[in-house]
Amino acid sequence: MRRSFYSWLMTQRNPKSNEPVAILADYAFDESDFPKQSDNFDEVSRFLEESASFAFSMSDFDAIWEDYLGH
């Protein structure tokens, strides 16, 4: 079974970075309702679009998801 997107994303945290993946990781870390156990693109994407308390570029998310799938 693939590790959750959130678990992988937390390995990308870097508060000093301006890279989109590091920014999303910091946002997700602070978001209590982030789907932490999910490895499903639709579930995470829907959360970001509809429920997140922050705004994030979905095109950046798509690229980050591709990186996640590659690991």
From Swiss-Prot:
Q: Which domain of life is it from?
A: Bacteria
NCBIfam families registered for this protein in UniProt: PRK13672.1
The record's similarity note reads: Belongs to the UPF0346 family.
Instruction: Write the protein's name.
Output: UPF0346 protein SSU05_1322
Say which species the protein is native to. Streptococcus suis (strain 05ZYH33)
